[in-house]
Amino acid sequence: MRMNGNDLAACAVIALGVGGVVVGSLLGVGNQAVTLPAVNPQPVVVDMPTEPEPTATPEPTPEPTPTVETVHFSATGDDLIHDGIFLQARERGGDHYDFDAAYAAMQGYYDQFDVNWLNQETLVNDEFAASGYPMFSTPGEITDTLYNLGFRVFSLSNNHSYDKGAAGIEASMAHWAAMPDDVVTMGFYNLETYDNYAYQTVNGITFGYLSYTEHTNGLPTPSGTDYGVVYLDDHETIAKQIADMRPNCDVLIVSAHMGTEGTHEVNDFQRETAQ
């Protein structure tokens, strides 16, 4: 359709009119205020990471105070009873042996120790007559004196262990077995198992005891005996006994009766054995 000039002018006016209405709506027409619709902003919820609750620091557990146990230990030897000692004891005792006078100078000395160990170098029993050098046997009453002095641990392995043969071993072991329960002896071992071990617990500390000898003055292990000494050159048996006992005690005490008679000089055998 073709529009004439007047039609074009009318269209232009309408277009302008529409534009005026739009502008007027925004800016206000004829100075009249235009109220815009109220806008109610909605709160925006944002998930924020939650701060962890502070963890209370635990109080440190105090280290337990270790319990310290102390044992005072003495070792004495050799208790070798010659004729003059037991004859004097018999004279003092009359109808028995009284060895107290022989040890009078030691009275009270051993009270300062918790454990008193002694090498009893002679067989002790009442089956054999008392005898001195060279084949010793000591009356059993000597152990009353030794016990009263404070001795509780006795080593029986030394060069005089076989002085009275198998019967001497048996008589001596029977005597020691009759002593009070707190007496511990070692040195005569079961010759099949070697496992009759000696233990003692003092102040919560467990001791194990082993004792050996270098020789028995040339006397062999007596025939007919089930018990005997272990010689220091029997390394295999010694190693086994030590391995057996170590797990069962806090302290393992091993005594070795060895050396050259009549001198304090250390010989090669002593040095090698100790090392």
Question: PLM features: what roles do these ranges have?
Answer:
Residues D7-C11, A15, G19-Q275:
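Acidic, metal/ion-coordinating pockets
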Residues M1-N6:
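Short, Lys/Arg-rich N-terminal segment immediately upstream of the first membrane anchor
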